Amino acid sequence: MAAVEAAAEPVTVVAAVGPKAKDEEEEEEEPLPPCEAVRWAPVGAVAEARPGATAFLEEATAEEPGAAPGSPPDSPGRTLRRLRAERRRLDSALLALSSHFAQVQFRLRQVVRGAPAEQQRLLRELEDFAFRGCPHVLGYEGPGDPASDEGDGLPGDRPWLRGEDQSEQEKQERLETQREKQKELILQLKTQLDDLETFAYQEGSYDSLPQSVVLERQRVIIDELIKKLDMNLNEDISSLSTEELRQRVDAAVAQIVNPARVKEQLVEQLKTQIRDLEMFINFIQDEVGSPLQTGGGHCECKAGGKTGNGCSRTGSSRTPPGNSKTKAEDVKKVRETGLHLMRRALAVLQIFAVSQFGCATGQIPPTLWQRVQADRDYSPLLKRLEVSVDRVKQLALRQQPHDHVITSANLQDLSLGGKDELTMAVRKELTVAVRDLLAHGLYASSPGMSLVMAPIACLLPAFSSAPEAMHPWELFVKYYHAKNGRAYVESPARKLSQSFALPVTGGTVVTPKQSLLTAIHMVLTEHDPFKRSADSELKALVCMALNEQRLVSWVNLICKSGSLIEPHYQPWSYMAHTGFESALNLLSRLSSLKFSLPVDLAVRQLKNIKDAF
């Protein structure tokens, strides 16, 4: 830039000084001998301004404010502004030309370093680029700019106009022209940037792929995904938010993935059915084939030189030489039997696939139906519970005025066999009645039987067993584990409160859920080390519930736990049918009574023995 300024200053001096100075300059510009020629500074180098140019600029700056807006075109101020605008155009043109030459040099280096097969293509691209022309880098200058008075041409090429005299149409045209030039410049700069990244990547100085190549590959991937997912995003992609686009993509992926998952599950189910069918066929073949192999016919066996109706163990493994015909008939019978069983098994599998409900009702024996109907009747269990509740209530009311407390003498009687009447009524009558009513229709859910063995089980007595029964105490233990009771009871704050007898919750009431978890934890802690039965643990829990007057609330928590009731109770059970409401009403008769029952009665003697040793 400074070199261009130094080159443009003599022109300005010629316009300001006059003909005499012009003649002197022409004399100075006479060609010098080659030995005395002065070498010019390179383009873009910094050059110091000469004293004459500095004085001229100061003088022009001093004259510029004095120029009137309506001064004629040949006034010094307007001439100075025009020369400055021309100087800016020359600077921009020189910069564009230098950039163009640099691009040509860059492409020439690509041609030289390129492969022989690529040189022809690079030369054609160089030719196209060389004749394309330099980009127009002049920005749009507003109407108030001094350079806008003369436009883009030289002085005298266009009529002199004021900015306010220009029409709106001319302004719009100039703006549109400027925008087009800017677009062309941006496009050319992008092309040059892509070429530079490509060359740097080929030379090894750029690690990642060029941005244009990355965008092209990403576009290919996105287009293929859109085709595979059957999505139409060309219309409303601009109006959708990021979350809406994500939801559309998830929905499209789900349409493809979900059927595949269903097919995989169906294939796994069919594999399981086929595997179970093969096991069933092998089982029946073993049952049917064993009589054929050990059938009671007359056979001749050479075992110790004796012939008889039976065969000894040493001679049974040998094949008699005269029984080849009998063996062929046996093999034929086995094949026919196997084919018959295969047809029956396929028929059963087809029925199962159609019905999906296992055996028909007509295949159930009448005696079994009567027995099941008898088991479903829970009215005797309710009567037994009512009788036990009334007996416990009578015994408790009889001992209420005396504050039923287990003393040391009573404890000695208990250990020696003299049982307390109220305690025995609670443990042997009330707890058993509650246990039987809770166990009505209760079973342990097990995924052991496959889908194929369910309908086939009715054909074989060995597979027609009822679901495995479950003890009601296990229901309380499952509730304890489901509610993470161990973490609640063994928390540091609760341990400290138990050690120092301080309330944890700051005086708030303990909920039934918290008290139930604590009670189950205490029963498990005391009874599990001594391997006590589930009945003993349930009796201890009932005694603790009566002592705390929470029997109804604790049982109600189990009844309201849907995650335990649904998978462990039959639809015809008392729990699923009535929700245990009538039983809770019966047990509520004991809620107002105070009890002080021993909880560790089943492990007290064992604890004493352990303490003794």
Curated annotation (Swiss-Prot):
It comes from Homo sapiens (Human). Residues 309-325 have a biased composition (Polar residues). Residues 421-602 form the RUN domain. Residues 160-235 form a coiled coil. The modification Phosphoserine is found at residues 71, 75, 497. Keywords: Coiled coil, Phosphoprotein. This is RUN domain-containing protein 1. One of its GO terms (biological process) is in utero embryonic development.
